[in-house]
């Protein structure tokens, strides 16, 4: 009887571990219903030989970060409006918010992360759905707030490539210098 009970418990534990491993790999893409109506924030100078400075403060939502393509589509709407208004040329410097790139850690995550009511809840979903990456990042984390560092390190390698492709691609597409926050 004892062997049977141990066998059942081991089988249940193995099944739970298998289901958790399967669950962590599932990344369903939700519907994308972001507001693409835009309003430019700061426009200093006149487009011309000396160039101009254009500040863009996009209104972003968690689901805008589901994929780099969604974020790109949102930012393109702002830059297209600026181009239509004649505000962009080769000497234009477009400035985006300070931490616009930091949120790339949320790309490719489960729907629960985007529905989180608070940052801590989103961080918990990130750790739960990327257990091996997060554990490795926690071991190499540095600084006073090792947990916060680990959340970023867990996806840092992916974020670097996404950041370069996204913001570099926008700068090239619109022929401007783009200053995007970390």
Language-model features: locations:
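Hydrophobic structural segments
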Residues: 1-182
């Amino acid at each position: 009887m004892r062997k049977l009970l141990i066998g059942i418990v081991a089988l249940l534990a193995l099944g739970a571990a298998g289901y958790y491993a399967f669950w962590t790999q599932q990344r369903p893409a939700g519907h994308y219903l972001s507001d693409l109506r835009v309003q430019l924030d700061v426009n200093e100078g006149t487009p011309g030989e000396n160039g101009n400075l254009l500040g863009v403060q996009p209104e972003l939502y968690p689901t805008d970060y589901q994929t780099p393509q969604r974020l790109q589509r949102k930012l393109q709407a702002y830059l297209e409006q600026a181009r239509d208004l004649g505000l962009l040329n080769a000497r234009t410097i477009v400035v985006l918010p300070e931490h616009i790139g930091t949120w790339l850690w949320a790309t490719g995550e489960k729907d629960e992360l985007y529905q989180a009511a608070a940052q801590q809840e989103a961080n918990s979903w990130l750790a739960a759905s990327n257990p091996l990456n997060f554990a490795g990042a926690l071991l190499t984390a540095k600084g006073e707030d090792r947990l916060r560092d680990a959340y970023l390190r867990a996806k840092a390698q992916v974020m670097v490539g996404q950041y370069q492709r996204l913001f570099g691609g926008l700068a090239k597409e619109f022929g401007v210098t783009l200053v995007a926050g970390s």
